[in-house]
Amino acid sequence: MSATDTARAKELLASLVSMPDATIDDFRALYEQVCATFELPDDAQVEPVDANGADALWVSAPGVSADTVAVVVHGGGFTMGSAHGYRELGYRLSKSGNLRALVVDYRLAPESPFPAPVDDVVAAYRYARSLDGVENVFLVGDSAGGGIAMSALITLRDAGEQLPDAAVVLSPLVDLAGESPSLVDRAHLDPLPAAVLVNGMGGLYLNGLDVRHPVASPMHGDLTGLPATLVLVGTDEGLHDDSTRLVDKLKAADVEVQLEIGEGLPHIWPIFSFHPDAVAATDRIGEFLRSHVAAPR
């Protein structure tokens, strides 16, 4: 673990809450500034696409398999973030997983609260599944995007559709009731006020729905029958227990699940491309996804 790189990652996270009286537009601009620090390699292939009505970007490294797709759901507290800002993560996932990344530019709250973001992710997943030659489709999300990804899995299962071959969630926000003890116990370690993320931005996303809504707040839903899932979380984040509680609930539902904990690492640490542990995490994710393709390559 690089202490310097970890400090830099925490500084970038802290910058998101550095502006007093920030508006939603301010937060969105700040998040794009953070994502702009992740340099996209020159050989990245990026192409916009209409994925069954959902805006998205195809992001690929050269020479990757065309038969495998990872639908990527960016983070941003339900209210910010973009596919453009997550091109670099999409590229790393493409390279490590030997796949094409379909990064979804889902609609954001408060303009488009639940279920709009989930609907967009489901639409993009269906689009990926419908493509000729595609045999494997995965779902990957971080933070609020991890929660949206879990909601999409529940939605697809309830609709009786073919599920993703596996899922990966990074520091997922899955309990909008804010019942994870780490929101308080680990607050001093986290540069982000995670409780504000849950209560404030989560409230905009719910738009009056119950904080224990079984789809919008997946920790309070039925997780039986979901695909194999890899969960990554850092020790230094308020949402730590959202991940550990999710893993426990998935195990109780007889879902294949693996947990990776980054010691001393902050919220959504795998997105910070300059950090050696983030690069290692991407390699681990790629290994996990490759182990769940229909015909291992």
From Swiss-Prot:
Reactions it catalyzes: 4-isopropenyl-7-methyloxepan-2-one + H2O = 6-hydroxy-3-isopropenylheptanoate + H(+); 7-isopropyl-4-methyloxepan-2-one + H2O = 6-hydroxy-3,7-dimethyloctanoate + H(+)
Which top EC class is given?
A: hydrolase
A Pfam entry, by short name: Abhydrolase_3
Q: Which gene encodes it?
A: mlhB
Q: How do changes in temperature affect this protein's function? A: Optimum temperature is 30 degrees Celsius. Inactivated above 40 degrees Celsius.
Species of origin reads Rhodococcus erythropolis (Arthrobacter picolinophilus)
Task: Describe activity control.
Answer: Strongly inhibited by the imidazole-modifying compound 2-bromo-4'-nitroacetophenone, by HgCl(2) and CoCl(2). Not inhibited by the thiol reagents iodoacetate and dithiothreitol.
Q: What is the protein's given name?
A: Monoterpene epsilon-lactone hydrolase
Q: Could you say which EC number(s) this protein's record lists? A: 3.1.1.83
UniProt lists the family membership as follows: Belongs to the 'GDXG' lipolytic enzyme family.
Q: How does activity depend on pH?
A: Optimum pH is 9.5.
